[in-house]
Amino acid sequence: MRYCFSGHESFPCKSMWLKKGYDYLVDRNRFTDPDAVVKLGVGKNMVQSIRFWLRAFGLLNDDEATEIAHYLFDDRDGRDPYAEDNATLWILHYMLVVTAVSSIYRLFFVDLQREKKEFDKEQVLSFIKRKCNVPE
């Protein structure tokens, strides 16, 4: 696995960004379009961050909305277009962990959890150094 700790332009995933990004895609737009800033109503770095978070949650693949994205967010047939159901949040958390885009989540919630159920700061640092092949 190639580890990645960037791409979100320092923005956490904000409320409704996944829906906003999904709607933008199904309207046949691309995040690289010159008018993406205007159409999405956010800054240039936020456009890239929305794209990153869609990929991280497994909702975007090769600039196309994925099956799970349609299942959740489609205005007509989506199960929870506005992410109001706790089950949607569970699905999204699962997708974030199993999708290797934002590898920090997978590292902590899958790999580290497999080794230790409880841990302290030093154990986390040692784990990260070991995973990234950094000498202790």
Sequence positions of predicted segments:
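Donor-sugar nucleotide-binding helix/loop cap in glycosyltransferases
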Residues: 1-136
